[in-house]
Design a protein with these regions (language model features):
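Membrane-interfacial entry segments at the cytosolic side of transmembrane helices
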Residues: 161-169, 221-230, 248, 318-321
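Structural signal for the C-terminal ends of transmembrane alpha-helices
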Residues: 62-69, 101-103, 153-161, 209-218, ...
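Short, Lys/Arg-rich, polar N-terminal cytosolic tail immediately upstream
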Residues: 1-14
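Aromatic-anchored segments of alpha-helical transmembrane domains
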Residues: 26-33, 121-124, 171-183, 232-245, ...
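Alpha-helical transmembrane segments of multi-pass integral membrane proteins
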Residues: 204, 231-343
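Hydrophobic alpha-helical segments with transmembrane-like composition
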Residues: 122-177, 337-339
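Interfacial loop-to-helix transition and helix-capping segments at the boundaries
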Residues: 14-15, 38-50, 129-143, 183-206, ...
Length: 355
């Protein structure tokens, strides 16, 4: 989802992680589009996909920038603005288009909703009124920017603390989180536990911790055994647990033990052989992974437009057509955005603002 470059100290991308971005974006996509076909919501896909991307971000940033942080060569200000200007123009474009289309339909937003979304501070306010405004997925960008701000500090701390203290601290944090989370009303789950930047920084920190063990544990290379069968089994087990858990736990905490393990297994699988690794390292999968951020930002609007054009009469046949056309259209739109909007705008910003 976030465009995190791996060229700083580690010159090779972890290709399996790059491709996995698309697979988990697809889960998020299905959570917003499959209900008419499945006749039930697929919130697991959205919440699991979001958890994966926060963990992945912590891991990948550590892989790409961690050595610089350790050596004291990390330029936090440049790092933040580089990533901000990669995210913000596309957010601004889709926010503006969505607001304009909604206005035509008689849907308007107040000044607080507009301001918090434009400034990407909406998740700091514990209210659904400001959370999913216009292009609703932009809340994720607010949390992402906060993770960028605290990355260097978290990396230094989490990679230097003793393992025993880290284990005790994480156990205590999980216990306190669970006790407090259970006091949150169901209606407040999204605007607090699911989206608050301070709480999603836990997932991000788990990604940094996962990188720490990926880098330092001698037996880590044995992890990709039975890849991807173990990983699919883990996700299915979590899916089963998801069905019986309360929203306060399943929206985020449920994924804490699983997503770091899956990220590390994906990373170690990059050096292994097997049909799954070859598939993830293939050019089509690498390309799909490279447009995952554009897919994420564009997909809600594309789903709306496709459903308006194709129509929907409640039948499974038309729901399936809508889903298929939406997925293909979103991928094509994402590639067009990357090639003709994101890349040119980023190049201009890099030349004029980030020299």
């Amino acid at each position: 989802m976030q465009e995190t470059t791996l060229r700083q100290d580690n010159t090779n991308r972890i290709r399996t992680l790059q491709a996995a971005r698309f697979l988990f974006i697809l889960l998020i996509y299905l959570s917003h589009s499959v209900e008419p076909l499945a006749h039930s919501p697929f919130d697991f896909g959205g919440e699991g996909g979001v958890a994966f991307f926060f963990v992945l971000s912590g891991f990948v940033l550590s892989y790409g920038y961690g050595p610089r942080v350790s050596r004291g060569e990390f330029d936090g200000k440049r790092f933040f603005w580089k990533h901000f200007w990669h995210l913000y123009p596309l957010h601004l474009l889709f926010f503006s288009v969505t607001v304009a289309l909604d206005y035509r339909l008689g849907v308007t937003y107040d000044a607080l909703q507009i301001a918090t979304s434009l400034l990407l501070v909406q998740t700091w306010i514990p209210s659904d009124h400001t959370l999913f405004v216009a292009n609703g997925v932009s809340w994720f960008l607010c949390d992402t920017l906060f993770c960028y701000i605290v990355f260097a500090w978290l990396y230094k701390w989490l990679t230097s603390i003793r393992t025993s203290r880290l284990a005790i601290g994480m156990t205590m944090l999980a216990a306190v989180y669970a006790c407090l989370a259970l006091q949150v009303p169901d209606r407040m789950t999204n605007c607090t536990l699911y989206s608050n930047p301070l709480l999603r920084a836990i997932d991000f920190s788990l990604g940094i911790i996962a990188y720490r063990f990926y880098k330092t544990c001698p037996g880590i290379r044995k992890l990709p055994r039975l890849f991807p069968y173990v990983d699919v089994a883990l996700l299915l087990a979590v899916y089963a647990l998801y069905q019986i858990m309360c929203p306060q736990i399943r929206c985020s905490m449920l994924f804490w033990p699983v997503m770091p393990l899956i990220v590390v297994r994906l990373a170690t699988a990059d050096a292994s052989e097997g049909w799954a690794t070859r598939l993830l390292q293939s050019k089509p999968m690498s390309w799909l992974g490279s447009v995952s951020f554009e897919i994420f930002i564009a997909h809600l609007l594309v789903i709306r437009i496709v459903q308006h054009i194709v129509g929907y009469d409640g039948s499974e046949k038309l729901a399936a057509i809508n889903l298929a056309v939406s997925i293909v259209s979103t991928i094509l739109v994402a590639e067009a955005l990357r090639r003709w909007f994101v890349k040119p705008v980023t190049d201009v910003i890099n030349r004029r603002l980030l020299r």
